[in-house]
């Protein structure tokens, strides 16, 4: 069987792990089964463990343990998409304990992403401020906007709306 080293704590990195998890979720969605669901849930649980910063609840970063680099919107959005995929599968499987855990973490993550979003009147440092409204800054303390962060962030918000509409979130 294929092994996913990302589920091993020694090999876990929050920049790479979501891609493994999303591949497992896609495999499950395609085949309605996957022999790697334990790995998916382990990765999701490890991501949730990173949401421990009292100053930025919902952000996927902790200064305890290994240095995974500075937090950023791309990692936060991909981690949130991973939790959403895990919630969908946990719901399909009737795993209420995981559903509750993932819902709580997703709401925290959504609050974090929303806090990164530019509102009208907050974007005066840009040449065309109105074009930045709605975009997500790369980091809380950084005015930079990166396309991948905006695109993955938009996907998170769209996915959240679908989960809410379907009564899953």
Locations of regions flagged by a protein language model:
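Glycan-recognition and catalytic cores of secretory/periplasmic carbohydrate-active enzymes
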Residues: 1-169
């Amino acid at each position: 069987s294929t092994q996913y080293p990302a589920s091993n704590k020694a090999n876990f990195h929050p920049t790479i792990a979501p891609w493994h998890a999303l591949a497992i979720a896609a495999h499950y969605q395609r085949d309605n089964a996957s022999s790697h669901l334990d790995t998916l849930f382990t990765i999701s649980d490890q991501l949730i463990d990173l949401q421990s910063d009292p100053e930025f609840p919902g952000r996927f970063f902790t200064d305890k343990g290994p240095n995974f680099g500075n937090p950023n919107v791309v990692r936060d959005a991909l981690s949130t998409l991973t939790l959403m995929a895990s919630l969908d599968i946990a719901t399909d499987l009737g795993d209420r304990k995981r559903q509750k855990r993932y819902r709580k973490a997703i709401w925290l993550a959504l609050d974090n992403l929303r806090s990164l979003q530019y509102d009208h009147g907050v974007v005066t440092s840009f040449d065309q401020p109105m074009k930045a409204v709605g975009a997500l800054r790369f980091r809380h303390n950084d005015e930079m906007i990166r396309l991948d962060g905006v695109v993955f962030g938009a996907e998170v918000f769209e996915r959240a709306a679908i989960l809410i509409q379907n009564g899953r979130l």
